[in-house]
Structures are given as structure tokens and as C-alpha cells.
């Protein structure tokens, strides 16, 4: 029997706590050919705490997009791979391509780039 692929749930923010878990889930998300939005966050970061419930609401509204949350202290190597310098940082990607980045808890900019890239991803 073939190995089962990682299931990527729609409508929720996927938190990864190990590099192995991150690699498996990111691979599955890339293979889904959906837009991916990654929130690089930290528990000690007030703007991160401010934007977290908004990010959850975006995930509930945009079922065709995969939303990840990565704690930069927990997965420091992943944050380094994405050149995260400040929190929160939101990275937009599709497949292997990094499309965009938002640094800071700028709700309007986060949502605008989400809409822009999800329309491109759907085309």
C-alpha cells in the first residue's frame, strides 16, 4: 500500500512544531498548487499576538489558500531559510516560488496581497 500523503486542512492555520513536520506539510501544500501564506511569529511579540486572530479569520474565509504559522524561536532554521528579520513576517508562495512578503502586522496589506496572489494563483 502506498504511503498516504500529508492532509492539508482548509479553513485553519497550520502550526508546525518540528522541522520534519514543517517539511512534510510544506511539501504537501506545494503539491496542492494552492497559494501558501506563512506567518512567522513569536510568542513574545505583541504585534504577532495582535494579528494572530485576524490571520485565523483570513484562513476561515479563504479555503483555497494554505495558511501556516511558524514560531521563529521553535523553528529558527526555517525562519533563516526565509530570511525573516522581524516579526511578524508573512511570506506568500506558490509551488517553489516566493511571490511576496509583508513585514509587520499590517492587516490591510496582508489581506490585499492575499487577494492579489490568490487571484493570480487561480488564473
Curated annotation (Swiss-Prot):
Residues 2-119 form the Thioredoxin domain. It holds the Pfam family Thioredoxin. One of its GO terms (cellular component) is cytosol. It is found in: Cytoplasm. The keyword Cytoplasm applies. One of its GO terms (molecular function) is mRNA binding. Gene3D superfamilies: Glutaredoxin. It comes from the Eukaryota. GO terms for biological process: defense response to fungus; heat acclimation; protein complex oligomerization; protein folding; response to microbial phytotoxin. Its main location: cytoplasm. Keywords: Cytoplasm, Disulfide bond, Electron transport, Redox-active center, Transport. Disulfide bonds join 45-48. Participates in various redox reactions through the reversible oxidation of the active center dithiol to a disulfide. The H form is known to activate a number of cytosolic enzymes. Belongs to the thioredoxin family. Plant H-type subfamily. This is Thioredoxin H-type. It comes from Brassica oleracea.
